[in-house]
Amino acid sequence: MGVTKKPDLNDPVLRAKLAKGMGHNYYGEPAWPNDLLYIFPVVILGTIACNVGLAVLEPSMIGEPADPFATPLEILPEWYFFPVFQILRTVPNKLLGVLLMVSVPAGLLTVPFLENVNKFQNPFRRPVATTVFLIGTVVALWLGIGATLPIDKSLTLGLF
């Protein structure tokens, strides 16, 4: 069982395009040499120049200086671990918290198999994948913001 979608050769529009010699890439200009030799190096060097320029002009420190004699009241992880930290903080059973964290990638792995019957690539015509993405984004943002608040306000974000 593959996830790769095969073209519908019974579609008359696709058959007409194939008869004219127009496959999936019949438009635009080739990537070699235009993009690879001229545009990509300019973009890469421009990005490096912007980063170096900002580092020279604004050498800001990252965080507070370390003080081994003063421990903060609450130790928080890095920002990208906030949703996971919030799950572990609010779920009373640690095994259940670990299972919830494992269920996120397992659920994301099932989405292509649920959406395999749909032949469209447009996200607005793929309701299951779009719904999973939007709900997952909202839940991740909700958990991430809640992890920065005290435990009594973390699930409601202090709104309710």
Curated annotation (Swiss-Prot):
InterPro entries: Cyt_b/b6_C, Cyt_b/b6_C_sf, Cyt_b6/f_cplx_suIV, Cytochrome_b_C_euk/bac. Keywords: Chloroplast, Electron transport, Membrane, Photosynthesis, Plastid, Thylakoid, Transmembrane, Transmembrane helix, Transport. It is a multi-pass membrane protein. It comes from the Eukaryota. Belongs to the cytochrome b family. PetD subfamily. NCBIfam families: cytb6_f_IV. This is Cytochrome b6-f complex subunit 4. The gene is petD.
